[in-house]
From Swiss-Prot:
Protein's name in the database: Small ribosomal subunit protein uS8
Gene Ontology biological-process annotations: translation
Function: One of the primary rRNA binding proteins, it binds directly to 16S rRNA central domain where it helps coordinate assembly of the platform of the 30S subunit.
PANTHER family linked to this entry: 40S RIBOSOMAL PROTEIN S15A
Length: 131
């Protein structure tokens, strides 16, 4: 695991957990990761999440599947990364799969989806997209 980009590590853990059909995955917790997972819960891509407080806080993500254990998340990909930050204005925000997916954006209003950013008329750093 690379500790350079902990958000990419979390997204990879979620992707690998869904491929191997796990019920839940665990990752070290941070405020940004909790905000991203909260957006995924609101949009229905994962069931729920818990923060286990111990010596090192751990984020438990409970994955969601359709019938016959087909993962709800088809694609989850990191866009902006530490070596190349990607910022977009509201009018430049792309759509994922013609609106079938979401883009998670870090804005001055918090971590929100692309649709919410358009409503609030804000742009920001494109963290990842999910479909």
């Amino acid at each position: 695991m690379s500790m350079q980009d902990s958000i990419a590590d979390m997204l990879t853990t979620i992707r690998n957990g869904q491929i191997s059909k796990k019920e839940k995955v665990c990752t070290p917790s941070s405020a940004m990761k909790v905000a991203i997972v909260h957006v995924l819960v609101e949009e229905g891509f994962i069931q729920k999440y818990n923060i286990k407080d111990s010596i090192k806080p751990t984020l438990e993500v409970f994955l969601k599947y359709y019938q016959k254990r087909k993962p709800v998340i088809d694609i989850i990909k990191r866009i902006s990364r530490p070596g190349l930050r990607i910022y977009k204005k509201r009018k430049e925000l792309p759509q994922v799969m013609s609106g079938m997916g979401i883009i998670i954006i870090s804005t001055s209003k918090g971590v929100i989806t692309d649709n919410r950013a358009r409503q609030l008329n804000v742009g920001g750093e494109i963290i990842c997209y999910v479909s």
